[in-house]
Amino acid sequence: MDYCGRECTILRRLLDEDVTYKKIKLEIETCHNLSKHIDRRGNNALHCYVSNKCDTDIKIVRLLLSRGVERLRRNNEGLTPLGAYSKHRHVKYQIVHLLISSYSNSSNELKSNINDFDLYSYMSSDNIDLRLLKYLIVDKRIRPSKNTNYAINGLGLVDIYVTTPNPRPEVLLWLLKSECYSTGYVFRTCMYDSDMCKNSLHYYILSHRESQSLSKDVIKCLIDNNVSIHGRDEGGSLPIQYYWSCSTIDIEIVKLLIKDVDTCRVYDDISQPYIRGVLADYLNKRFRVTPYNVDMEIVNLLIEGRHTLIDVMRSITSYDSREYNHYIIDNILKRFRQQDESIVQAMLINYLHYGDMVSIPIVRCMLDNGATMDKTTDNNYPLHDYFVNNNLVDVNVVRFIVENNGHMAVNHVSNNGRLCMYGLILSRFNNCGYHCYETILIDVFDILSKYMDDIDMIDNENKTLLYYAVDVNNIQFAKRLLEYGANVNATSLSIINTAIQKSSYRRENKTKLVDLLLSYHPTLETMIDAFNRDIRYLYPEPLLACIRYALILDDDFPSKVKYDISGRHKELKRYRADINRMKNAYISGVSMFDILFKRSKRHRLRYAKNPTFINFVSNIKWYKKELTSIITETVKNGERIDSIVDNINTDDNLISKLPMEIQREILYYSIK
């Protein structure tokens, strides 16, 4: 065998794209041992010529065969000349026939090289011969060899063919009808809607959307032959969603691709933070090309079929609010209003309940089209539904709702019997990790508080806002409620009892919540009620803080409650010893106990600069925290009043003419 150690002239000439029969005939006829000439890649003369990009001349092939060049020679890639020729861009039926050879193997079995022809490669060529397809598939029942490239591109014959520049419907139809033949070739990689992979429609649209050469005949042929318009790719997109990325949209093609499709259905894109769907993608600039254009005729077509109002709402508001096409949204709402004004009201409710980013202009557009904020749907006002939205609540949206007659919801329980703010509190503030939202919650409360008839309103479970704030251990919100007048002594459910349980779950400053509540002086009855219930706690500090407070109210407190405090005899002994110290220490004939716990803050202010009062805490061990807080507050208030008096006396005014002691007395009454 004559392997070319240097470039073999005849083989190199056969690879030239300008080679012709006239030019090469003499060289072939005069070449010595042409059948022995092999290049470094293992190609013989036939390999070289049929791999040439030129228009293959059957006369040259016949001439090479007549000179003994082997049809069955395999090159380094394992390909015979037939296998190499099947990758040509313009395969000819007659040449394939010439290159096919039958032979007997070592077992004397009749074999053929027919399976070397790579149908996958052939289907990607520009010129498909239907006769050749029928010959290979029907007559010869061709099967893929190990050298076919299906494993590389992963596509079936139909999938490959539709990606060619100009697939012909008649070829496509024949391929689709030939799936029944047992050849071993894959015709379509995605056969069923449940496969969740691109089907032939996806590939056709994807490969032709830039060239704008989509054919209605090809699309119709695919659809009519069981290529499903309902098939979804790996990300969940339908063929019609691929079509939206074309710069020109043909409504007739749209009609073909959406028949019986739920065009308003939406889903979450797992690869990116977007809500996707047929209508949603059509309206979203992100999934369209420039120039962005929305045809209301197509929009109407998309919302004519079956749909739910939730899906319609999510479709038209699924994208970035900075890119909303308000004109289109307004037209869609007008269309529904013409059918029934209650539809727009339902869309408002659904938008507030499910919208991933509620936009005030969209809400205003819904109001302009007949929706209202003061109408209930299933016993819920719109504000109720907004507060159960799983996405972040926008303070500005809340303000817009209540300022547009949505404030009525504030004094009504929702359809599940809960307070208006219940969903807002529970959905995001049910563990310490969400306390970054406290500012939003407090800002929302500040807006709603102006409309509240009763801050201690109870829901169907006899729970108040303060109870819920304590239940979710939201100290800042509880503090704001107390500042606005919420009653720590609410009798419906024990707030103190709940605080003991929830406070003990905090890793740091375990008594902060109960300290806040106790600073608002719950009554003895409230404390008794708390300890008459089942008490649960993880750490004892909140419980002990409440016991200390209750003993100040009544030394005999332990005997008046069901909860067994007597087991903590050591703590009780210590607390009572501190109380006795306070009762036996006097200033101006008044016991420290009375000054600290019985008299008013105004009375206590008189002792703000008294060293005995200020230093008293040093002799107290178990009530040190409580006394330090009281004395610090008293001194701070005293300094505040002194500062006010100093400022008053810098000007000539009526109060400045009064003696300073009287000025202070007047200011004392400003302290509760």
UniProtKB/Swiss-Prot annotation:
Per its UniProt record, what PROSITE patterns does this chain match? ANK_REP_REGION, ANK_REPEAT
Q: SMART domains under this entry? A: ANK (SM00248)
Task: Identify the Gene3D superfamilies for this entry.
Answer: Ankyrin repeat-containing domain
**TM region(s), chain numbering:** none
Give the record's keywords alphabetically.
ANK repeat, Repeat
Q: Where are the ANK repeats?
A: 41-74, 77-108, 196-231, 235-266, 282-312, 344-375, 378-410, 461-490
Query: Which PANTHER family does the annotation name?
Result: CYCLIN-DEPENDENT KINASE INHIBITOR 2C-RELATED (PTHR24180), POLY [ADP-RIBOSE] POLYMERASE TANKYRASE (PTHR24180:SF45)
| Designated name of the protein | Ankyrin repeat protein D4L/I2R
Provide the organism lineage as a comma list. Answer: Viruses, Varidnaviria, Bamfordvirae, Nucleocytoviricota, Pokkesviricetes
